[in-house]
Amino acid sequence: MVDYYEVLGVQRHASPEDIKKAYRKLALKWHPDKNPENKEEAERKFKQVAEAYEVLSDAKKRDIYDKYGKEGLNGGGGGGSHFDSPFEFGFTFRNPDDVFREFFGGRDPFSFDFFEDPFEDFFGNRRGPRGSRSRGTGSFFSAFSGFPSFGSGFSSFDTGFTSFGSLGHGGLTSFSSTSFGGSGMGNFKSISTSTKMVNGRKITTKRIVENGQERVEVEEDGQLKSLTINGVADDDALAEERMRRGQNALPAQPAGLRPPKPPRPASLLRHAPHCLSEEEGEQDRPRAPGPWDPLASAAGLKEGGKRKKQKQREESKKKKSTKGNH
């Protein structure tokens, strides 16, 4: 007999949040539209996962299941007369697709995360704490007929929207999105870009989601201002992306933190040794005097001679005065 706890891969004391996380993961993994090469097994697994979630996510159904197993939900329970079951005539499981749609709020789980932010204000929705989302009135896809339905496979689509100001949302000037991927979730990728004018500045937000990792880049008038990965700012990735784009206008760094100048390439040392030796030689040896000027030399010698004669006269006077005293 199928054990619903084993189907979802959770412990018997799992919390409601654990059960939701398990269903989300397995429903996305086994959705028939994502497993066209193994559709029969995927449909079976998808149905089991939906049944397990439908029972374990409801406190009353879970309590009966824990006590009497699946038979208790069917109105049996090993004789059925020794307990009162609220499902006396048997519990009917819903269509797994209905469970799936209800869980994801009627929107395509393979793409709604990627469109959510640009359209939230437009539809009047507000995003709560990270990981929780307020559900809007109706399906996201019902607003625009160009989106694929749940049965279309979500394997590839490319769509764009412009001039949302005409729809009553003056701040959002443009939005475009591209999503693609094949069978399975391993190679699914989505890129969405939205542009807003805020106080005369063009703010562009680019979101890239690939293999479960979300990367968000925010530009202001063409200059990259912030970069987050899975909601966390990454300064190293920001610096690397700025470098790649040639946007090196980073904040001034203290002198001690500036990178040292790179050494001269070895190729230059090999190909121009005479140039380097001449430069280094000029730095090491003393500077030679300028051209010889005969007039300046004569003036110097004459001045030196006068000083020497004056010194001799002073010494002679001192000697005479010394003899007179004796």
Curated annotation (Swiss-Prot):
Tissue specificity here reads:
Widely expressed. Highest levels in testis and brain, and lower levels in heart, spleen, intestine, ovary, placenta, lung, kidney, pancreas, thymus, prostate, skeletal muscle, liver and leukocytes. In testis, expressed in germ cells in the earlier stages of differentiation pathway as well as in spermatids. In brain, expressed at a higher level in hippocampus and thalamus and a lower level in amygdala, substantia nigra, corpus callosum and caudate nucleus.
Key word Cytoplasm present in the record?
Answer: yes
Region spans: Interaction with KRT18 = 119-242
Region entry Interaction with HSP70: which residue ranges? Answer: 2-146
Q: Which residues cross the membrane?
A: none
Keywords linked to the UniProt accession: Chaperone, Cytoplasm, Disease variant, Limb-girdle muscular dystrophy, Methylation, Nucleus, Phosphoprotein
Q: Which disease is it linked to?
A: Muscular dystrophy, limb-girdle, autosomal dominant 1: An autosomal dominant myopathy characterized by adult onset of proximal muscle weakness, beginning in the hip girdle region and later progressing to the shoulder girdle region.
Q: What is this protein called?
A: DnaJ homolog subfamily B member 6
To which species is this protein native?
Answer: Homo sapiens (Human)
